[in-house]
């Protein structure tokens, strides 16, 4: 179709499968009381019915059918084809609250390693005239079993609106609309910006041209993103400075709307599709002295710290974004101080990301000794990774075996089954492969066969899994199966992302689209008082 190679343009299923919501993911930050077995539980809930197809699905004695409104984020139907107000309200209510906003703290300075002051609430920091701050904002996905937004991420429009007022007068903003409904392109968008081979944006349902993503700002289920906003307080400021931040959703951006609903000749199309508020927060900071106000947050303080750290962790790593990883670690220490073992586990995640394996092992040991201890399956997963990195393959295998057999009574009672997580299956194959290399003769042959079986199980769940195909190629070479090895090498070439080809497309788009170039940076700071407004062709 694309005259290039196999590419996944949209993938709801793995997003759900590898999440905590499904009960199959081993590495989620949060887990629900009960696993959600499929999409229907959320999007097609049971409703009582006397329809001839009604059944007693849940054993309650009540006949029901699955609701075929298919609750989701299609808020454009009423405007476009005149569906009922009731159906629009059902969709609106379904997505409200799905992206929580938390104005968590400030940094006194212009970059991400400036001194942090927070969390905000119940008290607020006092700002000083003339200082520059970063407003640290957390976006947390709530009540969903897949990445937000998923679906048609080329045209779904989710953005963050920020309004800063000083005694009622606007002094900073982001995410505003122009008179035609186009969103300021320098805003933070919760989307994926996907490019064609020549560096043009995929924005006309031209999936056959998908080549590479410039960035992907979608947020996994039970995870968070941390967004930095820069603000300079006026030198003569006094009184109260108020920051209001909202996450907003519109089914189609203006560019896409104008394609299938073109404006009259000589006119600019106006995007009048409804905008739904997904989440919001507001804080009033005193200037110089006094007390501010903050909206009440019902979420516990440890969770707010945890979400702040998760957002930073997802950005952090080696090199340019190491500062985000350091801040994430500091946040997880706060979670520990507030009495939750999640802080130790997430600190271990950060240490693994930084390559500090001994520190990760220490954090996991602390998590296991904590009262109450961390989730045992989480300890086993990250413990196995640490042991494998240290060459302790037998210890890693013991943990992985407990995981793949879900030997945790609490997990089983909640409907969890980790045997379908391809990351776990690949890890089992990798460890068995490593153990086999230590053997000779029949012992090695048996070990290679065992490793082979685990990678084959991965392909049952995910036939395009590049890790499994690569290892199966190596295994079959050692086992003397040259033809099978060649076949898996071919699949690996077919499914592996083409890193060498992406640079030209990305470079072309970054040059042509300054706002997207900024949003694709390793560390992104959005200026709330930006003076220039270079807008690329084709407003959104």
Where are these regions (language model features)?
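Alpha-solenoid helical repeat scaffolds
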Residues: 306, 345-348, 376-382, 413-419, ...
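Primarily the internal scaffold of c-type cytochrome electron-transfer domains
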Residues: 1-221, 227-301, 307, 504
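Residue-level recognition of tetratricopeptide repeat
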Residues: 301, 340-342, 374-376, 410, ...
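Structural marker of alpha-solenoid helical repeat scaffolds
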Residues: 338, 370-372, 406, 417, ...
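TPR/TPR-like (Sel1-like) alpha-helical repeat modules
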Residues: 401-408, 456, 466, 470-501
